[in-house]
Swiss-Prot record:
Pfam families assigned: UPF0147 (PF03685)
Superkingdom of this protein's organism: Archaea
Homology family: Belongs to the UPF0147 family.
Entry protein name: UPF0147 protein MTH_1407
């Protein structure tokens, strides 16, 4: 009976890892879009680049990476100089990452 519980929990964990990897890939793509957009202020593009590097660091736990990026992006989403389209993308990223953190 204990073996069944262990197998079931490992399947759940593997599914969670795949889901977080898919989410990180989607978020990374959005961040690259922000980084390449010249209408976005340089400080926001730098924050997007830093966030992308953190997301792609396999040495950290996925929840730690998600929480760190949420913190960075939450700060820049309140920047008065961020264009509306970039703010909307940041909010989309925050929404995606909140699902991993929980």
């Amino acid at each position: 009976m204990n073996i069944n519980i262990i197998l079931y929990s490992s399947r759940i964990q593997q599914g969670g890892l795949n889901m977080s990897n898919e989410t990180f890939n989607r978020v990374s793509e959005i961040l690259r879009h922000i980084m390449e957009d010249n209408s976005v202020p340089r400080n926001i593009r730098r924050a997007a680049e830093e966030s992308n590097e953190i997301l792609n660091n396999p040495d950290e736990d996925s929840t730690v990476r998600a929480s760190t990026v949420i913190s960075i992006l939450d700060e820049i989403s309140n920047d008065p100089n961020i264009p509306i389209h970039a703010r909307t993308l940041v909010w989309e990223i925050l929404s995606e990452l909140e699902s991993i953190r929980e």
